[in-house]
């Protein structure tokens, strides 16, 4: 199974209940448009239809009716088989990060410079990507700061992150492009950083890297400071796949596709 096939199945499982209950959502348009960023609404509809028809129920037709409403609304929004067609990437980013905004709005892009945020478990190839594509830009690396300070990865004091953010602010104030190099495994962490960077007028590009598990283990064996396998497993369990709406651009570099 390829990366894309795996993610398609994962998103169908995650959003499988949306056709039945979308109409109860507070921001109905928003939830459907956000879902359409990562999954085909047509496939969700077919999955929900099969689910409804396979149930033993006193009112088997109710879920199917909800599914038909879902299909009609998805088609009306123009997201039946593709993501919403925003006016530009700036408008798209703002739509997904503001409380209330019409998707058909046209906003002027006032970003001034670019910031790249790396994401992925250790040994996925982030450093290699930076070497090949960084273009000499400043790199703020949490691992690098740990080595600089002689701080153990187990140290939870926050001094490494605080210093990294302090250095990032210096570059942000100067509107200087840079690369933020860390695992950034959860959506919460990525969105907190996006909020910081965009607050200074940056366009944030998220670069997610992934390598086969066997390759990760092989690389770990030749690493100077090896990561215990249980720690790697915990990080994989913790990983939340970056979604296209999280940044101005989200790229997926799989199996060394740099």
Where are the model-predicted features located?
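Short catalytic-loop micro-motif centered on adjacent basic/acidic residues
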Residues: 178-182, 206
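Pre-Walker A (Motif I) flank of P-loop NTPase domains
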Residues: 106, 110-116, 174-176
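N-terminal pre-Walker A segment at the start of P-loop NTPase domains
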Residues: 75-110
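Conserved substrate/cofactor phosphate-moiety recognition/catalytic segment
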Residues: 127-178, 213-217
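Divalent metal-dependent catalytic cores for phosphoryl transfer on phosphate-bearing substrates
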Residues: 1-68
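Conserved phosphate-donor/acceptor-positioning beta-strand/loop module used by diverse small-molecule
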Residues: 200-219
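Conserved GTP-binding G-domain of TRAFAC-class P-loop NTPases and closely related GTPase folds
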Residues: 116-119, 124, 136, 213-258
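Acidic, metal-coordinating catalytic cores used for nucleic-acid/nucleotide bond scission
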Residues: 181-190
């Amino acid at each position: 199974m390829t990366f894309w096939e795996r993610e398609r199945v994962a998103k169908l499982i995650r959003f499988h209940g949306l056709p039945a209950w979308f109409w109860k959502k507070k921001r109905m348009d928003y939830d459907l448009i956000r879902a359409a960023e990562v999954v085909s609404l047509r496939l969700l509809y077919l999955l929900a239809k099969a689910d409804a028809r396979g149930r033993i129920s006193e009112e088997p037709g109710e879920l199917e009716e909800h599914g038909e409403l879902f299909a009609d609304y998805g088609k009306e929004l123009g997201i039946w088989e593709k993501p919403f067609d925003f006016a530009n990437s700036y408008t798209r980013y703002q739509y997904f990060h503001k409380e209330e905004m019409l998707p058909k709005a046209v906003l002027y892009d006032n970003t001034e410079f670019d910031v790249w945020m790396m994401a992925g478990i250790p040994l996925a190839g982030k450093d290699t990507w930076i070497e090949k594509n960084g273009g000499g830009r400043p790199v703020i690396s949490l691992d690098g700061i740990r080595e600089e300070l002689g701080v153990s990865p187990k140290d939870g004091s926050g001094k490494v992150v605080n210093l990294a953010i302090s250095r990032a602010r210096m570059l942000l104030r100067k509107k200087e492009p840079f690369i933020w190099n860390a695992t950034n495994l959860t959506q919460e962490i990525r969105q907190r950083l996006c909020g910081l960077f965009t607050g200074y007028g940056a366009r944030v590009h998220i670069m997610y890297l992934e390598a086969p598990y066997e390759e990760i283990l092989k690389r770990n064996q030749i690493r100077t400071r090896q990561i215990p396998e249980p720690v790697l497993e915990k990080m994989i369990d913790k990983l939340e796949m970056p979604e296209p709406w999280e940044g101005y651009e989200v790229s997926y570099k799989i199996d060394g596709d740099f």
